[in-house]
Amino acid sequence: MQWLADYWWIILILLVGMILNGIKELRRLDHKRFLDNKPELPPHRDNNAQWDDEDDWPDQNKKK
């Protein structure tokens, strides 16, 4: 870990460079064009659809 104490500034420069490149690429992104051309999402499929019709509660009008 001695090398980390000696060369911490190089690691810091690399991290700052990666952050700046990320910001630069995000600025190039045209979000308006993406929103105009985005694909339609398929309808949401409920995984519990087969159980939705079943009545979980007992009938209150049943005579005991």
Swiss-Prot record:
Transmembrane regions listed in the UniProt entry: 3-23
Subcellular location: Cell membrane
Pfam families attached to this UniProt entry: UPF0370 (PF13980)
Basic and acidic residues composition bias: residue spans: 36-47
Keywords tagged on the record: Cell membrane, Membrane, Transmembrane, Transmembrane helix
Location, primary (coarse class): membrane
Chain residue ranges for the region called Disordered: 36-64
InterPro entries associated with the record: UPF0370
Bilayer topology: Single-pass membrane protein
Cellular component GO terms held in the UniProt record: plasma membrane
Sequence similarity: Belongs to the UPF0370 family.
Record-given protein name: UPF0370 protein YPO3055/y1425/YP_2677
Organism: Yersinia pestis
